[in-house]
Design a protein with these regions (language model features):
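Short S/T/G/P-rich N-terminal loop/turn motif that feeds into the first structured element of a domain
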Residues: 1-59, 63, 67-74, 100-104
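C-terminal structural segments of small proteins and small subunits
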Residues: 69-95
Length: 104
């Protein structure tokens, strides 16, 4: 069975280092450790990776790999996930979500 990779790229309204680090901290607080998570990572764009193919129009990246589609679907309605959205959405200029079936 394929795992589901949930990748989210946030562009902030206020793109200061303090705000980007605050969003990374919120990702770690609210989005890590959900049932069915096999990988979690959150961080900021790498400043010196600027080849022509690099997309750099985001501030914070979130990657969560779930063991199944069912685990992903449960995460979407989990209270901690919804609280993360409620608390952080006011500073989002854009959010892009990429979901993919993946396997090793």
């Amino acid at each position: 069975m394929a795992q589901l990779a949930h990748m989210v790229y946030f562009t902030l309204k206020d793109r200061t280092p303090a705000n980007t680090e605050a969003l990374v901290a919120a990702c770690r607080k609210y989005l890590n450790g959900h049932p069915g998570t096999v990988y979690f990572g959150a961080g900021t764009v790498v400043p010196d990776l600027d080849r022509p193919v690099n997309v750099r129009d985001f501030d914070v990246a979130l990657q969560v790999v779930f063991e199944s589609r069912a685990a992903h679907d449960a995460y979407q309605t989990a209270p901690r996930h919804l609280q993360f959205i409620e608390e952080n959405k006011p500073n989002w200029a854009q959010v892009r979500v990429f979901d993919a079936d993946v396997s090793a």
